[in-house]
Regions:
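Non-catalytic, usually N-terminal nucleic-acid engagement modules in DNA/RNA processing proteins
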Residues: 11-193, 305-311
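Single conserved hydrophobic/aromatic residue that forms the stacking wall/gate
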Residues: 1-13
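Glycine-rich phosphate/ribose-binding loops and adjacent secondary-structure elements
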Residues: 170-173, 182, 186-188, 194-315
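Cys/His-rich short segments
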Residues: 316-320
């Protein structure tokens, strides 16, 4: 059956529901996203390997994902703002989602120090000290002018102790409230490049179902534009990831888009869609393609192998 639910820009979500899989439309100021959808990762504003914004349109891409941390370091978010925001900077006119930078701070950066205010860390480029907290992340994303801004969160290492994961979830909730308040301030003062920028919150809790569920209940009350599941696909068994999604899904708002961060293998996407997820991203497709690894219905092939040099057959017989 079709259900239409409207709470304003970005929240119009038409869906057809069969079991937990959903078919929907997510409307934004930069266009409507047909879901389920995969976001192509353009970390610093371009897909590695030489793909242009025109190429993305040609292959039917709907959303481009750029990274707050990397763009802040180089070329600098203020420069991007001076050039009119990411859409003018990249010449991509569709929806753009910017990651908050939290994952990179906790995975790439060295010598980090976490406090209630935020995180102090050393740049992976030259080692200089940087501070980033909820307000700073929102300010950078306001300069970038993305369609969707992700809230600043703590992505704990896996495995992590239950007590630390619980404290981290509570801190991430407090940071989310600060993100929401800062975005409202930036819009009110006319500072944001995109006054219609949307905010997604991120569910954390490592691989502890009780923490995942409780955290989702907390952030679902904040009336955000969308909700993401973060901190998965970081080394835990695949079945554990699926179980965490299944545990959290009943507590995710039905009328809001759902995003599983960092997941992008065909099998993972199908399994997650069946569990009620709408949106995905991963560097794997473009990274694999650059190295000649191609997905087919029969599995992955390495097109650089000598046996394919004079092979005239279609790469995938099902697509021939």
């Amino acid at each position: 059956r079709d259900l239409r639910m409207s709470r304003g820009l970005g929240d119009v979500y038409k869906r057809q529901q069969e079991h937990n899989a959903r078919r929907g439309e997510f409307k934004t100021v930069h266009g409507t996203v047909q879901t389920p959808a995969f976001q192509n990762v353009a970390t610093a504003g371009a897909i590695k390997g030489g793909l242009s914004a025109h190429d993305l349109k040609d292959i039917g891409a709907q959303v481009m994902l750029c990274n707050t941390y990397h763009l802040h370091l180089r070329p600098g978010d203020k420069l991007v703002a001076d050039m009119g925001g990411l859409h003018k900077f990249t010449r991509w006119n569709g929806p753009i989602l910017t990651d908050s930078g939290g994952f990179q701070v906790f995975s790439l950066a060295k010598l980090r120090k976490i406090t209630e205010e935020g995180v102090t860390f050393a740049s992976h480029l030259d080692g200089h000290r940087i501070f980033m907290g909820p307000e700073e992340s929102m300010q950078i994303q306001a300069n970038l002018g993305s369609t969707i801004a992700m809230a600043f969160d703590e992505c704990v290492e896996n495995p992590a102790q239950h007590d630390y994961s619980k404290d981290s979830c509570e801190r991430t909730t407090r940071w989310l409230k600060r993100c929401k308040a800062e975005m409202a301030r930036l819009k009110h003062e006319g500072i944001s490049v995109n006054p219609d920028q949307l905010l997604f919150g991120i569910n954390q809790g490592c691989t502890y179902a009780d923490l995942r569920v409780e955290h989702m209940k907390q952030i679902a009350e904040l009336e955000l534009d969308g909700y993401a599941i973060g901190g998965l696909a970081v080394g835990e068994p695949t079945e554990v990831m699926y179980e965490m999604i299944s545990q959290v899904e009943p507590y995710m708002p039905k009328d809001k888009i759902r995003y599983l961060m960092g997941v992008g293998t065909p099998g993972n996407i199908i399994e997650a869609v069946a569990r009620g997820v709408d949106l995905f991203d991963c560097v794997m497709p473009s990274r694999n393609a650059r190295h000649g690894h191609l997905n087919t219905w029969g599995g992955i092939i390495n097109i650089k192998n000598a046996k394919y040099e004079r092979d005239e057959r279609p790469i995938d017989p099902a697509c021939g």
